[in-house]
């Protein structure tokens, strides 16, 4: 009984930490490129992301290095 209760508490604790991170980590492999431009006036080159999900994931995981969608397709 104690082991079962302990196991349930561990699972709930893990689920809480996983739920706190809402960043998409797994994106589909479909190649629908989008061109991103650095947010906030940073002076760096535009960057091509494999798809919108990849751009969103990058922005979520890298708060100080975000990109705005410039247009569909690869950056020129």
Swiss-Prot record:
InterPro entries the UniProt entry points to: Kazal_dom (IPR002350), Kazal_dom_sf (IPR036058)
A matching Pfam family: Kazal_1
Signal peptide, first to last residue: 1-21
Subcellular compartments: Secreted
SUPFAM superfamilies, per database record: Kazal-type serine protease inhibitors
Described purpose of this protein according to its UniProt entry: Vasodilator protein that inhibits vasoconstriction of isolated rat femoral artery induced by phenylephrine. Since platelet aggregation and vasoconstriction are key hemostatic responses, particularly in small wounds, this protein likely participates in the antihemostatic responses during blood feeding. Blocks L-type calcium channels (Cav1/CACNA1) in left ventricular myocytes isolated from rat hearts.
An annotated Gene Ontology molecular function: toxin activity
Species for this entry: Tabanus yao
Kazal-like domain: residues covered: 22-76
Keyword entries, A-Z: Calcium channel impairing toxin, Disulfide bond, Ion channel impairing toxin, Secreted, Signal, Toxin, Vasoactive, Vasodilator, Voltage-gated calcium channel impairing toxin
GO biological process: vasodilation
UniProt keyword Transferase present: no
Name under which the protein is recorded: Vasotab-TY1
Tissues showing expression: Expressed by the salivary gland.
Cysteines engaged in disulfide bonds, as pairs: 23-60, 27-53, 35-75
GO CC field: extracellular region
């Amino acid at each position: 009984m104690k082991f079962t209760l302990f196991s349930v508490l561990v699972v709930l604790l893990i689920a809480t930490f996983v739920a706190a991170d809402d960043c998409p980590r797994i994106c589909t492999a479909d190649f629908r490129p989008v061109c991103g431009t650095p947010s906030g006036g940073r002076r760096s080159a535009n960057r091509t992301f494999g798809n919108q999900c990849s751009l969103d994931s990058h922005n979520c995981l890298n708060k100080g290095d975000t990109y705005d969608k410039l247009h569909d397709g690869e950056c020129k």
